[in-house]
Each structure stands twice: as structure tokens, then as C-alpha cells.
């Protein structure tokens, strides 16, 4: 047995104790895996190709950072923001990541707290759940331009599939132009009047906004070893067309199905979708090739990535002709992401491009490109597995269009029923072994 991380050799007693503990742990896991293997079909072990996290930290919620959008969030000065986020798995310890990735000046956080949200519809926390967060033991931290920082771990009981309130006090003048944001939250966040309300049970006279800012991840140490599945995608992953505040994006619904089926064996499923995102060109947020390392590989506990990208590369050629790309270019970009994921030991799952006939962005040429890309995704044999969103969402009588019952109205994005159909179509056993050690 190899030991590392010690400045001096372990004595014989310590080595013997460690070896004995390791044998007991191995036996326990062997029994658990053996029992679950009896319950699963032969296809399930594909998920075991991915790596297992060594740090113990797993992301339970994420949002992909974007540069500020004028007018989306007002300029802030001596105010507190309270962000409501929905967990996927639970844990006994918690830490957060704050991002100044697109900031134009150092960002001072004067106070930071986490609590259980009383309701996603109001800026009130459950009494007795508030916990102050620190950074190197200090309540305040200045985040350099372009940097991402972690809070100190705190003992905090996180329940799966619940809402947390993360409150950040910004004592200095913080213009909108320097805020790192996530445009499309589908969840209200709250801005206080003047003052530090980070630890307050409720906000007086709050202003609600539908986006997130500064917070890019909430991470936990689960009671049972598990890992993270990252959904990388565009507006269909970001949840456009679903109902605000209900957490009806397909990654949310997949996470709920996994937890309800496997409980603490379930991995987390975190959402790194960006509305309008493309593979090869920026539009809202960095292109997927540029953000893959930050938004996938850097996530705590990542072991699997689901790639739902490419439709905007096809569709936006109608409105941005000079950025038109071919199916071959899209396939090349997807192949790059697959290779980069595999190089880091991740299981990589592909998603077919859904129907979009009848939409503002539709063209016959775009449909030809979509079909060619889907042919590659289904039959290229580069992905470890494929989720066929196209087959789930299309109208059998007109396969280039969304099934009317699943159409949010724009003929591109599903509604709540469509997102539920996507989640229900996914074979959960593909993901079970991400919740077990190898």
C-alpha cells in the first residue's frame, strides 16, 4: 500500500491500523457494489469509466458566469443581495465559490451568510438556520479582477432538493458593469435597501430580479461518497420555456429522479447551461470550447459531463450570416469536447439536437445541418452514451417540429411537460455508479 503526503515515515502501528481500516472499507464497498450490481442491467457499468473525486467536495448547485448585461442588475452600493439556489444533493459541510471573472475592479464582499430559504418566492430564511461564512477566517474578502475564490468550509446540514439563501453584502460602489452575472436564473433574487442584511431573517422593501450574480457554485461534503454530473448546454439546459421558480429545467428534474430513486447513492446534477450558447462563437457567454475547462473540468467532484450544444450554431446563421458554420465544423467542435473530457477521465454523454421547424431561426439548410450532426451523435461511437432529446421532443407526424404538447410557444424550447418528458426518458442506471467508489 502506498502512502503519500507525510513528511516522516508512519510507525508500524499506524501503518497496520490504516491497512486494517482500508480492508474493512474495501469489504464494505464490495458488499454495497455487489448488492447494487444485482439490481442493475448489464448496461449500467458504462458509468464506471469516470474518475472519482479525491477531495470529498461535490458541487450541489452551479451557474455559469457571464459578463454583465446593461440594465439586468442595477448598480449596487452599500447593499445586500440574497440569492436563492436549489440543491441537488445534501451534505454535512458547505462552502461557496464567488466569481469576479468578468469584473473590471477588485470586488469587496463585506459579509456573507448562508441559510435555508423559507420560500423561493420571498427573501425570508428559516429562523435558526443562518450561518456566517468566512474567507481565511475573516468575514470580508476582496476578490481580485478575474479571480474565483472559495469560502472556508462550515458545518451546515444541507438537505437534497431544497432551497438555500446565500446573502452577500457589498459595502462599496459596485456598478453593474463590474458584476459577474448569470442572465437567466428563472429564480428571483433580492436586493436590500442600504445596509448589511446578510444575516437578517428578512429583507425590508426588497427589489426582486430574475438573474444571479457573483455566486458560481455551492459545494458540499456528502455523508456518502458521490460525485458530480455537469450538464453543459444552451438555453434548453438553462431552462428557457419552463416555469419560473419551479425548478423544472431538465437537469433539475433529472436530479430529482436520481435522488428519489437512489437516495444517497445519487450523484449531483449541476447546470452549466447558458441561454444562446454556441460551440464555435460567443454570443451570450463564452462559446463552449472556451468555457469547457472552467465550467466542466473545474467543478468539484466532476465525473461525468452531458453535452447539449450545437443547435444555436445551426440556428443563428439565419440572423448572423457571417457566423454560419457547417455540420462538419460542429462535429469537429463536439469531438474536441469529447476528447478533452475523456483526457480528464470523465464519462461523456451526448445529446441530439431537438427539432426547431416553425421557429424564427428555422431554415431548410439549418435542418440539413441538424440532421447531419444528429447522425454523428447517434452513430459516431465517440460518446460513452447518448440521450436522444430529438426523439423525445419531436412530433411523430412531423419530425422536424416539436410535439405541440411539449412546445413552449416559440417552436424551439420545451415547456414544463417537455422538460419532464426529457428527464423521464433518461435511463437512471447510467448514473448510479457515479455515487459509488470504484
Question: What would you call each of these model-derived segments?
Answer:
Residues 242, 274-329:
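Oxyanion-hole/transition-state-stabilizing segment in secreted/luminal serine hydrolases
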Residues 80, 213, 251-258, 284-300, ...:
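Alpha-helical scaffolding within the catalytic cores
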Residues 1-25:
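N-terminal secretory signal peptides that target proteins for export/translocation
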Residues 30-42:
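Bacterial N-terminal signal peptides
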Residues 289, 315, 354-438:
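Catalytic His-Asp segment of secreted/periplasmic serine-dependent ester chemistry enzymes
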Residues 226-251, 275-278:
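Catalytic nucleophile-elbow at a beta strand-turn-alpha helix junction centered on a G-D-S/GDSL motif
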Residues 5, 34-35, 46-232, 242-244, ...:
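N-terminal secretory targeting modules
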Residues 95, 228-233, 237, 267-273, ...:
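Structural recognition of the beta-strand scaffold that forms the well-ordered cores
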Amino acid at each position: 500500500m502506498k502512502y503519500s503526503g507525510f513528511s516522516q515515515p508512519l510507525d508500524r502501528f499506524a501503518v497496520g491500523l490504516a491497512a486494517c481500516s482500508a480492508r474493512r472499507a474495501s469489504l464494505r464497498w464490495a458488499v454495497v457494489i455487489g448488492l447494487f450490481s444485482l439490481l442493475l442491467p448489464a448496461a449500467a457499468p458504462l458509468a464506471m469509466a469516470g474518475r472519482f473525486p479525491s477531495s470529498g467536495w461535490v458541487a450541489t448547485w452551479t451557474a455559469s458566469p457571464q459578463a454583465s448585461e446593461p440594465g439586468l442588475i442595477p448598480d449596487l452600493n452599500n447593499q445586500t443581495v440574497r440569492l436563492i439556489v436549489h440543491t441537488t444533493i445534501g451534505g454535512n459541510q458547505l462552502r461557496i465559490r464567488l466569481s469576479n471573472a468578468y469584473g473590471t475592479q477588485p470586488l469587496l464582499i463585506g459579509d456573507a451568510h448562508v441559510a435555508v430559504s423559507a420560500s423561493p418566492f420571498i427573501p425570508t430564511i428559516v429562523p435558526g438556520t443562518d450561518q456566517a461564512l468566512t474567507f481565511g477566517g475573516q468575514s470580508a474578502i476582496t476578490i481580485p479582477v478575474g479571480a474565483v475564490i472559495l469560502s472556508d468550509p462550515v458545518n451546515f446540514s444541507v438537505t437534497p432538493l431544497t432551497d438555500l439563501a446565500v446573502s452577500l453584502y457589498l459595502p462599496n460602489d459596485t456598478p453593474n458593469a463590474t458584476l459577474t452575472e448569470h442572465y437567466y436564473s428563472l429564480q428571483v433574487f433580492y436586493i436590500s435597501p442600504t445596509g448589511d442584511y446578510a444575516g437578517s431573517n428578512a429583507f425590508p422593501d426588497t427589489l426582486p430580479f430574475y438573474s444571479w450574480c457573483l455566486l458560481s457554485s455551492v459545494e458540499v461534503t456528502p455523508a456518502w461518497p458521490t460525485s458530480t454530473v455537469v450538464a453543459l448546454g444552451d438555453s434548453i439546459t438553462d431552462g428557457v420555456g419552463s416555469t419560473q421558480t419551479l425548478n423544472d429545467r431538465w437537469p433539475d428534474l433529472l436530479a430529482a429522479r436520481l435522488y428519489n430513486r437512489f437516495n444517497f447513492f445519487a450523484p449531483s446534477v449541476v447546470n452549466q447551461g447558458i441561454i444562446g450558447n454556441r460551440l464555435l462563437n460567443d454570443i451570450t457567454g463564452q462559446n463552449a470550447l472556451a468555457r469547457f475547462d472552467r465550467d466542466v473540468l473545474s467543478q468539484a467532484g466532476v465525473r461525468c459531463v452531458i453535452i447539449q450544444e450545437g443547435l444555436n450554431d445551426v440556428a443563428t446563421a439565419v440572423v448572423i450570416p457571417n457566423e454560419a458554420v457547417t455540420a462538419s465544423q460542429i462535429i469537429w467542435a463536439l469531438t474536441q469536447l469529447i476528447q478533452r473530457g475523456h483526457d480528464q477521465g470523465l464519462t461523456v454523454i451526448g445529446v441530439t439536437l431537438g427539432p426547431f421547424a416553425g421557429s424564427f431561426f428555422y431554415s431548410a439548410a439549418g435542418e440539413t445541418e441538424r440532421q447531419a450532426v444528429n447522425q454523428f451523435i447517434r452513430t459516431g461511437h465517440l460518446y460513452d452514451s447518448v440521450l436522444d432529446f430529438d426523439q423525445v421532443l419531436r412530433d411523430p407526424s412531423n419530425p422536424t417540429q416539436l410535439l405541440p404538447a411539449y412546445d413552449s410557444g416559440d417552436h424551439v424550447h420545451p415547456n414544463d411537460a417537455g422538460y419532464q418528458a426529457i428527464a423521464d426518458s433518461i435511463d437512471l442506471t447510467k448514473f448510479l455508479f457515479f455515487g459509488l467508489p470504484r
